[in-house]
Amino acid sequence: RHTRYYASRGLGDVYKRQDTLFFLFGGKAYAIFSLLFGFSFFIQYNNQAKKGKDFRLRFLWRLFLLFLIGCFNGAFFPGDILVLYAIVGVILPLVCKWSDKAVLITAVILMLQPVEWAKFLYAMNNPDYVAAPGQWLVHHRNMYPFLGQTDFWAMVKSNLWDGQLFSLLWGWGHGRFFQTASLFLIGMLIGRRQFFVDLSGHRKFWLRTLLISVVCFIPLYYFTEALPDLFTNKSMLSPLNTIFSSFRNFAFMCVLVAVFVFLWQQVSGHKVLHGLVPYGKMSLTNYLSQSIIGSFIYFGYGLSLYSELGVAASFGVGIVLFILQLGFCHWWLKNHKQGPFEGAWRKATWICS
């Protein structure tokens, strides 16, 4: 994200590669993580159900802990997603006893972005209506200057207030609340149907998912790109862009997940991907450490390299950080079952149990 603000347009091919990476993972990586969040809830809920225990209240406590972890992360990085997860995650214990059909219908309704459709219809029926600028812009303007200042505690204070409000309001204004809730429910359904457990037995399902997603993604991509030419009224354009960008990202996320499933089933692909398993097991630790290390590298309280590192250098920093984290994950898991933050979260979840 840093490079999209400070990269020089004169970098040509390097900048194009950055845009390619953003095209591949922007809005999709978070979607995959959201899917897995719902899937992990099912695993925990199901494991406790087998013991005759109701996991719902314990999960709400777990979400409260996640909220606190998100605040800690947000103190360093004003783009935290954990607080959003803690808020939206409340939907999981509310619907976990519903039938598959009811959960699927709810997931579809949420994915359709009903609030954005309401905004579009209102703007269409009221041609003189001009939507107010997103409130997140105010908090972004308040927060951004502190990122370059040397006062660490002033930055933390700004990030915890304006930074979190910016992140949450941006998420609301860009359909993330509804899409995240939908992905949570879809992840839970995948767990119920064991689509990630018996991969060979569900090969047809994943093949259909791949083909349908590719067929849907292509027209969605071009339609989204053409929206500014089709709708000059920004009050109509903005919600439509949110809606169809959400659909497009969901379709491409399904492509990535299906491709990953097929690679995992291949011997050569399995060997390569298996080496990344420790990184996934410590995803929370890696996410938090990326925020801490990244903020120190780029923000004013640390090395203040936000205006010095361009696309290529920032990409290099990301690769080096990933390699170091992967090595640490392999080393740590030789003697521990979970990462440090994962272990602390688990222990706090089951406190007084």
How does the language model describe each region?
Residues 240-248, 283, 306-326, 330:
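Membrane-interface transmembrane-helix boundary segments in multi-pass integral membrane proteins
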Residues 13-78, 82:
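Membrane helical hairpin/interfacial module
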Residues 209-210, 264-293, 311-312, 337-349:
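Functional transmembrane helices that form membrane-embedded active or gating regions
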Residues 54, 91-106, 189-211:
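Solvent-exposed interhelical
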Residues 31-46, 83-94, 175-198, 248-267:
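Specific transmembrane alpha-helix
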Residues 109-186:
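Long hydrophobic alpha-helical segments that form multi-pass transmembrane helix bundles
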Residues 208-264:
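Alpha-helical transmembrane segments and terminal signal-anchor/GPI-anchor hydrophobic tails
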Residues 1-15:
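Single conserved hydrophobic/aromatic residue that forms the stacking wall/gate
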